[in-house]
Amino acid sequence: MNLTFENHKNGNGGFISLKNEIEEIGRLTYTIQPEKNTLIISYVMVFPKFEGQGMGKKLVEKGIEFSRENQWIIIPHCSYARSVMLRMKDIEDVFAQ
């Protein structure tokens, strides 16, 4: 399965979508607080037929990459994103616990 990510940034918010060759698999929605150098992950959603395949984790990893590129700290308001990040190593540079 060929997966692609698209970042749909609009002002201080947006979402990252994950797609295969045919359709959207899920998305991570975020808000940027530029004055605080933070990226807030609002929620991570994966369509039911793709659940249990690690797609949500891939979205969180892409959010981490986006945050690192911009030198932002992530505040995960989404409980799923927070639980994934708590299990990850080497993200202290971007994770506000």
PLM ranges: what are they?
Residues 1-13:
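Active-site rim helix/loop that mediates acceptor-substrate recognition in acyltransferases
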Residues 9-10, 21-22, 28-38:
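A conserved beta-strand-loop-helix scaffold within acyl/acetyltransferase catalytic domains
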Residues 15-21:
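STAS-typified acidic loop motif
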Residues 44-51:
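A short, internal acetyl-CoA/4′-phosphopantetheine-binding micro-motif in the GNAT/acyltransferase core
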Residues 52-65:
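Conserved acetyl-CoA-binding loop-helix of GNAT-fold acetyltransferases
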Residues 62-97:
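C-terminal structural segments of small proteins and small subunits
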